[in-house]
Amino acid sequence: MSNSNIHTTAVIAEGTKLGNNVKIGPYCIIGPKVVLHDNVELKSHVVIEGITEIGENTVIYPFASIGQPPQILKYANERSSTIIGSNNTIREYVTVQAGSQGGGMMTRVGNNNLFMVGVHIGHDCKIGNNVVFANYVSLAGHIGVGDYAIIGGLSAVHQYARIGEYSMIGGLSPVGADVIPFGLVSSKRAVLEGLNLIGMNRKGFDKVKSLSALKAIEEIFSGEGNFAERIKQVAEKYNNNSIVIQIIDFLNQDSSRAFCRFEK
C-alpha cells in the first residue's frame, strides 16, 4: 500500500489489501477481504464488503455499495465474490452485489465500463467491457451483458436475460427477453394525448381558450398538408388565442429533437 492516500475518517479493516497509489476518501468503509489494485480511487462514503476485488484505475463515487450479499432468500452466507476489472467509472449510489451458489458464486464486471448514478447490478451478473449503463438501470440476477452494449436510463432487465454485444436498449425499457448482438430495443415512447386542461384550469386559464387550443393542436398534428403549412394555417386561424400563440412560438423554435407524436 505504498504511496496510498487514506483519509483519517475512513475505516479500513485489518486484512484489506491495497495496491500502489490507492486513494480512499472520507468515511469510506472497506472490509477485510477486499483487494484494491493500483490507482483505485474511492471518493467518499463508499462501502466495499465481502470477497471483493477492484481493478486498477477504477474510480468509485460517493455512496456506492460494492460486494454486499445478494438479495435472494436462498442466500446462506456462502463465500461468494464480486470481481470488478480495470478503468471502470462507478458513480453515486451504484450497487453491485456478490454472486450466489446458484450462479457460479461470482458477480463479474469487465473493464472500461461506465455505471451512471443509481445503477443496480444484481447477483451473478457477468458484465463485459466498454458497456454504458445510464442512470438507474436495474439488472436482476444472472444477466450477461456483452461488450460495448448501451442500456438507457431507468431500464430494467429480467433475470437470466442476455444482452448482446454492441446492442442498445432505449431508456425506460422493460427487457424480459434476450437482446441479440447489434440489436436496437426500445419501449413505447411518450405520446401527446392533448392538453393539460385540468392544470390549465387550476392556473386560471380561460376555459373557452383552452378548449379552442385543444382543437388547434389537433389540427396541427393530424390535419391535411405538411406540418409547416398546418402550423401557419393554425397561427392565422387562432391569432387571438394567446395559448395557441404560445404553442406556435414553441413549435417554430429550433430543436434537435422531434415533437412527441400526437395520439388522440
Swiss-Prot record:
Transmembrane segments: none annotated. It comes from Rickettsia peacockii (strain Rustic). PROSITE patterns: HEXAPEP_TRANSFERASES. Its EC number is 2.3.1.129. PANTHER family: ACYL-[ACYL-CARRIER-PROTEIN]--UDP-N-ACETYLGLUCOSAMINE O-ACYLTRANSFERASE (PTHR43480), ACYL-[ACYL-CARRIER-PROTEIN]--UDP-N-ACETYLGLUCOSAMINE O-ACYLTRANSFERASE, MITOCHONDRIAL-RELATED (PTHR43480:SF1). This is Acyl-[acyl-carrier-protein]--UDP-N-acetylglucosamine O-acyltransferase. Involved in the biosynthesis of lipid A, a phosphorylated glycolipid that anchors the lipopolysaccharide to the outer membrane of the cell. Its main location: cytoplasm. GO terms for biological process: lipid A biosynthetic process. It catalyses: a (3R)-hydroxyacyl-[ACP] + UDP-N-acetyl-alpha-D-glucosamine = a UDP-3-O-[(3R)-3-hydroxyacyl]-N-acetyl-alpha-D-glucosamine + holo-[ACP].
